Amino acid sequence: MFNQKIIEQASGKLTGSLTKSSSLVSIEKERDACGVGFIADVNNIANHKIVVQALEALTCMEHRGACSADRDSGDGAGITTAIPWNLFQSGLKDKGIIIQKNESIGVGMLFLPTSKLQESKKIIENVLKEENLEVVGWRLVPTVEEVLGKQAYLNKPHVEQMFCRSSNLSKNELEQQLFLVRKKIERYIGINGKEWAHEFYVCSLSCYTIVYKGMMRSAVLGQFYQDLYHSEYTSSFAIYHRRFSTNTMPKWPLAQPMRFISHNGEINTLLGNLNWMRSREPLLKSPIWKNRIDELKPITNKDNSDSANLDAAVELLIASGRSAEEALMILVPEAFQNQPEFNKNTEISDFYEYYSGLQEPWDGPALVVFTDGKVIGATLDRNGLRPARYVITKDNLVIVSSESGVVQVEPSNIKSKGRLGPGQMISVDIISHKILNNKEIKTSVAGKTPYGDLLKESRQILGHQAFFSEQQVESKKLMQLQTAFGYTNEDVELVIEHMASQGKEPTFCMGDDIPLAILSEKSHILYDYFKQRFAQVTNPAIDPLRESLVMSLTIQIGHKSNLLDDQPVLAKHIKLDSPIINEGELNAILESKLSCAHINTIFKVEKGPNDFKKQIEQLCESASQAILSGNNILILSDKNDILESEKVSIPPLLAAGAVHHHLINKGLRQDASIIIETAQCWSTHHFACLIGYGASAICPYLAFETARHWWSNPKTKMLMSKGRLPACNIQEAQANYKKAVEAGLLKILSKMGISLLSSYHGAQIFEILGLGSEVVNFAFKGTTSQIGGLSMEELGQETVNIHSKAFSQVKTKKLANYGFVQYRPGGEYHINNPEMSKALHQAVRGYNPEYYNSYQRLLQNRPPTALRDLLKLKSNKQPIAIDKVESMENILHKFCTGGMSLGALSRETHETLAIAMNRIGGKSNSGEGGEDPVRFKVLNDVNESGNSDLLPHLKGLRNGDTASSAIKQIASGRFGVTPEYLMNAKQLEIKIAQGAKPGEGGQLPGKKISPYIATLRKCKPGVPLISPPPHHDIYSIEDLSQLIFDLHQINPTAKISVKLVSEIGIGTIAAGVAKGNADIIQISGHDGGTGASPLSSIKHAGSPWELGLSEVHQLLAENQLRDRVTLRVDGGLRTGSDIVLAAIMGAEEFGFGTIAMIATGCIMARICHTNKCPVGVATQREELRARFSGVPEALVNFFLFIGNEVREILASLGYKSLDEITGQNHLLIKNTDIELAKTRGIELNSLININTHTWTKFNSVHTNGPVMDDDILAIPEINDAIKLENEVAKHFKIANTNRTVGTRLSGVIAQKYGNEGFKGLIKLNFYGSAGQSFGAFLASGVNLKLMGEANDYVGKGMNGGSIIIVPPAGTTYEDNNQVIIGNTCLYGATGGYLFAQGQAGERFAVRNSLAKSVVEGVGDHACEYMTGGTIVVLGKAGRNVGAGMTGGLAYFLDEENKFIERVNSEIVKVQRVITKAGEQQLKNLIENHSAKTGSLKAHNILENWNTYLPQFWQVVPPSEANIEETNTAYSSNTITAY
């Protein structure tokens, strides 16, 4: 035991964070990730070795987990095995208890409250007695508490096992009975022990399996639970799990495995899944449960984690008679719509199609390992976003794990090796002694029932109906309708008309600089109070354009059937290919066999806003009555023949949400679908909101009518005739609009990492800004609304205000333009207005304090725009003299510029910003796109005119200046990220998201790719460059931790920052980032600028930094993590007052983007996305760049003004430094002098009056600890080779725990020689299983050879050298059919060679720039976003080859003639090798591969060249179409015949 002093110390330091939950965090916001796997003996031979191997495997994945604030208490580790009867028998014998073989006995592994031990055991025993089960006995689990970390120890439950038996039930019957028993126990304890119920938890209660787990590190699990290393603890299988949680509050029950599953990943759709499961409960029936089904409810629990809830859903299905494999197929389905293999196995797609109408997918990155004690298996999510490698041995072991090499197997004992692909499953049936692959499992499950016949009987597919070909209302009435429903001129011209013309969403630039809807004096429609949420860190966004094969907008409407039916029956329903339906399609639904109720959503104004809620309640009652009358489609419609001033439409979002939740509460939600027929829906955000709150389909009749009027306008037809607009007919215009909305919807889904509309439907993945609890609880229950806002009455009044404008006495010929998007005099206030910009330009160009004071006054006297405008400062201290305040220099060091890329900005602007920031000791940020090495030099040749030959295009220079950005960004495209780039940084920023478009990637158009930009980005001029929505090496929190490790590895002196965007739940994400060893966390507000972004993203994604920063600071402080990181904030900072307020909320550093550009010369023309910037700031056109007049001095002056203002405010508050006020929220009070036009219901409690925590300021750089590269660099011969540029060769053993090998060595070389200068040769030979990121950022002159296998990210960012990977000696399996390297290899590689004698995983060569490689098979998405280099694949390829590929060449051997269907042909074309140059390029690489690896496959191809050459395909993007390797017109030698 710990001694008392240690316990007291731990209590003093930690108890506050352990016993009090954060005000800003709940379990729903907690995120986790992990390492997971299983070992199973196919022959079901139980032995102790399997348990020991599982514990060792767990230890080998310790790096995938994390620890609590004490750095010792693990976030969780655990193991599931068969029940070790021999061990228990010997222990129970001492108590006189004998267990007979094959007796029906269950074992409960229990966490019991130490203070209520006897009370809880009494409840358990009473329930068992009620259920006619005998309590055989109790067993205290032997534990060693000393090995626990402090937090884990302080929160340790009492761990005891309970044995019970049945005299009349079979084992399977007892297993089902124990499910009922557990639910009953939990319910009784919830009623009788409310105060301590949270301390009670059933790890497992089964007659087949048992779970040992807890809040501990991997190595501690077997030390704590003494049973696990007992020789009599035998099992034929073991599942193991190591957890990485974003939260540090110790929760023993959240450790995994759960009762049936272990889960690595995150369920993005959790809230929707919970809502739908609750709504599904009234329908649940099963003969197994007879009349006791209600005792199982609730099935899920919003207070549990996503993994626990998925486990509960799996448990329900298994206990109700489904196999474990079938349960997972139903809940986590494969992407079946675009699978060529299913064309021959339609029964599988029929199965998935059938269940898509009953159960929405639990969507998100997931490797799920599962067992019911009879079958052990694993399945991967539809996108394949988690790694899963397997080995099958000759002695019949199956090993599946997140990483290869965690279980040691002799090479000669390996029968086969592989990986699970997207949506695939593997299982081991230990009863029938079978290993089942994906096809066998799914064919077996799907073949049991004729699902195709059931679909034919019950499903109607809604065919496309023609759009109206004529206008339905006259122009005058149209404008009145548009006004009544809240349209503005911008909505029509910038949104609807653009979409009708172009078929895509409008793009805009800069950011959202108008007041939040709740702060605005102008009326806003309800949608404007909702902000879209998005994926960052804990799960990835998806690319809806390049990965459309996994996405679908399909939805089914009608009555839902019972999920538990043992004889499947599907209710009549209609399948829609899209939730956006036109008037004809709505009529077709009305005329279908389904019963439809048309419910009007008009309320009468004469009763006043007071009656608003009552009339919506009447609407809800009408909906439930319609269902009880037999209707299974509810059409909520605001369509009225006559528009009247006294009859106002209930906002459709309010109507949808209110009816949706009302029906859930009444138990009727599954009986009908909701369709919205509305005029008030036109932007993609509107559609997303309606679907998110329960609508299955929307008919936006007024938007379609607006498109028809636009097409009919003579001006439109004239522009079409002149070619200034694309020509289309009236129906095509409406189709274009619909197409744009659908594409926008897919983007909104994908930015949250969701693939299917059915998973987004009802998921409520939004954050509310400006609605009070009355409104939220009524119609949007479960959605976070942190700041309160409008009451029902106030919302009713705003609704009436919008409607009444349609009946104004003032007659106009055009719709009102309030300037919500573009600044206009008299319109909505924009912070970035001409008056402000002019004052700032005048202030900084000559350091004029008078003009700065004018600038300051303009911002101080603005209308309330941001949340901070509602606050004011209050200090109990006396003011001090300004000379007592910290120096200007100290303050300036805390300033940074935002990450603005060279490419979006001109070279002149980018370098001017960097020079200015270096002068003041601040930090500029490179943004994405690399940096010219010339900028790393210090200027010493500046003449009296301020010019330098080194940077001749700049003005106002000084000797000693440097244009190197102190912060180098690593974004998803990895453009220009080389070893030299990384080594010339003081900080390395991982950009996860951008404030103006979080969850989205980017695209730099070809017209901005000048020769200079192309050189930096390692691509060809004029070729568009795509930055993926996610980092393809960050799909989870432990992946981010790995990238942080990689960057600390190459440059151990640089701090690593992670840029996040403010949203609800960011605190838990930040906690995970801090635990992942980041040095800096940056929180960006929603109002940050951008060079180009969809308009709907600028307006509707992200939240204010005030909320995000406060949440992050508070949660980190409460969880003892605040001293691990520096917090930086950006997004609309413009004054010293902003800096002080941000510091009080927790910020220590401050980023400036838009305002820094304005100070440097930007005039806010807001045309950045066009490449036509009139002042040369945001363009690559040379004639426009020549107009750039900015000099570093102007930006220096701006920051001097800001710094001086900060010092003045600090002095007035009585504080000497920013550090003294950091996180001191008590200095903020609500400014009661400000009265908002709309409400007095704003609540700022999350920003003010918060407990102040103390912490030690973080200054140092985190380290990776001892690593293999340190040992390599400690070898004198290696050092000599670097110093003298000699050749040296060394040999090493390697394990999966040796990560990022070769990278620190590469950093040392790049620091000394740059990317190209090293002329020596360092050969390193390894034997074993390499950890992640083997050879990442490899430098020229370093050759790595591995005899064994490697995990994910091989060659990530490599710039030179070579990586050769071959199977170990003694292998007898066929090399080319085995997986030898993991996922996402060669990501962002800028050079070098990779030869792998085996298959690669998913996303091979993603965003490859210049590397060349040969591998012998690849998974899905090979060569995605590739911009250069050459890839050869000598084996099978997965789907979606070449998606987003704009450069480079790839050759694929197609022996089965199936390759063409696997190519994404949106950009690339596929052809045979038709020129001698192409043939020679291919042959040379294969010859190299053969020579380097000894590949038999390569040797055979070369020996039979004329036979194999015709079987190769060449994948050619447009940029490579006219070169000698691809085009006979450019080649002197062509291949005329084979």
UniProtKB/Swiss-Prot annotation:
Name the PROSITE patterns for this protein: GATASE_TYPE_2
Q: Where does FMN bind?
A: 1109-1166
In which compartments does the protein localize?
A: Plastid, Chloroplast stroma
The cofactor binding remark recorded in the entry reads: Binds 1 [3Fe-4S] cluster.
For this chain's UniProt record, which GO biological process terms are given?
Answer: ammonia assimilation cycle; L-glutamate biosynthetic process
- Which domain of life, per UniProt? Eukaryota
Which catalytic residues are annotated? Answer: C34
| Catalysed reactions listed for this entry | 2 oxidized [2Fe-2S]-[ferredoxin] + 2 L-glutamate = L-glutamine + 2 reduced [2Fe-2S]-[ferredoxin] + 2-oxoglutarate + 2 H(+)
Subunit note = Monomer.
Protein name, UniProt field? Ferredoxin-dependent glutamate synthase
Origin species: Porphyra purpurea (Red seaweed)
